């Protein structure tokens, strides 16, 4: 009972916070400086239903090169399903504390867990976030262990996982073609990919200028597909040395290049720094889906992209090696890919 009580206490979503607990307060030099954020900038938007395939491929390539992030519209995932995913996520975080405590763990190796911050075992300052982490592929292997409450959770999230995986594979094809590679290159090279999900919950924060939902980081995987709360902004992307706010566009999904696609592109495409900030007015939720290479597959720059004028930027490695290195460090240290340069 004592351990369960401690787990409940760890979660931000179990209470309303009128004051800022000290363990969330960043040193002054590490605070988000919200007054310097560019609020009216835009990241590229790509219409996947455009009949001009060449234009879609070109737009995806340009976005990967210049921003590392883009939004997609007309992506084929039904708006009603997207709304259901967000609603069932909110229902989960509103469950009684004792119900949520059944899933709590601070062990990053667990495939299904509810936790808080990022890596509470290593951190000295925590982040203003609770999250439910799920492994999603193959579905039949993991769904039985997913939350049984809310009752519709497994069906809704399972359907979304299947559709978002197919969207990811379509995007791989466009990304491959934009690099001058065969359309199937990325999917084939990355092997039988794992798929993870993080359902992120950012409660109202009494002093948002003192902390983060997540500090600046890059994603260690290949491709991330983010479903954002279309009522509350919070994602910010580093572009040309400035933090820009990603303003939610109804019906859109946000795509970002992970570290592995930067490596496969030989540095042509960018896995960029991004962060999540919080606010004092409203809670916020997001659902991030991660496509991850097979652990044992060898990764490195595509041979076709290595020339005398453009030698290999990164050495070959396995995703297992990369992921272990990523988790052994603090989230906001130097870009993990720097450790794999030739």
From Swiss-Prot:
Protein family: Belongs to the iron/ascorbate-dependent oxidoreductase family.
UniProt keyword annotations, A-Z: Dioxygenase, Flavonoid biosynthesis, Iron, Metal-binding, Oxidoreductase, Vitamin C
Keyword Iron annotated: yes
Residues the record lists as binding Fe cation: 217, 219, 274
Pathway where it operates: Secondary metabolite biosynthesis; flavonoid biosynthesis
Catalytically driven reaction(s): a (2S)-flavan-4-one + 2-oxoglutarate + O2 = a (2R,3R)-dihydroflavonol + succinate + CO2
Domain of life: Eukaryota
Span of domain Fe2OG dioxygenase: 193-293
This protein's name: Flavanone 3-dioxygenase 2
Organism encoding this protein: Oryza sativa subsp. japonica
Gene: F3H-2
């Amino acid at each position: 009972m004592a351990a369960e009580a401690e787990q409940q206490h760890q979660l931000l979503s179990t209470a309303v916070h009128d004051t800022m607990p000290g363990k969330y307060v960043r040193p002054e030099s590490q605070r988000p400086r919200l007054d310097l954020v560019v609020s009216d900038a835009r990241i590229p938007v790509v219409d996947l239903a455009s009949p001009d395939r060449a234009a879609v491929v070109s737009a995806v390539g340009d976005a990967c090169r210049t921003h590392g992030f883009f939004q997609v519209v007309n992506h084929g995932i039904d708006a009603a399903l997207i709304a259901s995913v967000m609603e069932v996520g909110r229902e989960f975080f509103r469950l009684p504390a004792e119900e949520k405590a059944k899933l709590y763990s601070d062990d990053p190796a667990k495939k299904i867990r509810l936790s808080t911050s990022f890596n509470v075992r290593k951190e000295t300052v925590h982040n203003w976030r609770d999250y439910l982490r799920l492994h999603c592929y193959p579905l039949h292997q993991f769904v039985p262990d997913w939350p049984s409450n809310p009752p519709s959770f497994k069906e809704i999230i399972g359907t979304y996982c299947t559709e978002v995986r197919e969207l990811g594979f379509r995007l791989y094809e466009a990304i491959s073609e934009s690099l001058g590679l065969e359309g199937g290159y990325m999917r084939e090279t990355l092997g039988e990919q794992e798929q993870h999900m993080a359902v992120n919950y950012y409660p109202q924060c009494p002093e948002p200028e003192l902390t983060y939902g997540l500090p600046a980081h890059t994603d260690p995987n290949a491709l991330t597909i983010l479903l954002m709360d279309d009522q509350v902004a919070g994602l910010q992307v580093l572009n040309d040395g400035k933090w820009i706010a990603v303003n939610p566009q109804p019906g859109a999904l946000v795509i970002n290049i992970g570290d592995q696609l930067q490596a496969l592109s030989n540095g042509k495409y960018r896995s960029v720094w991004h962060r999540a900030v919080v606010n004092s007015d409203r809670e916020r939720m997001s659902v991030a889906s991660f496509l991850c290479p097979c652990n044992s597959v060898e990764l490195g720059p595509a041979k076709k992209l290595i020339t005398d004028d453009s030698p290999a930027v990164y050495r070959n490695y396995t995703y297992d090696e990369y992921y272990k290195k990523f988790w052994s460090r603090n989230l906001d240290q130097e870009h993990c890919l720097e450790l794999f340069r030739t």
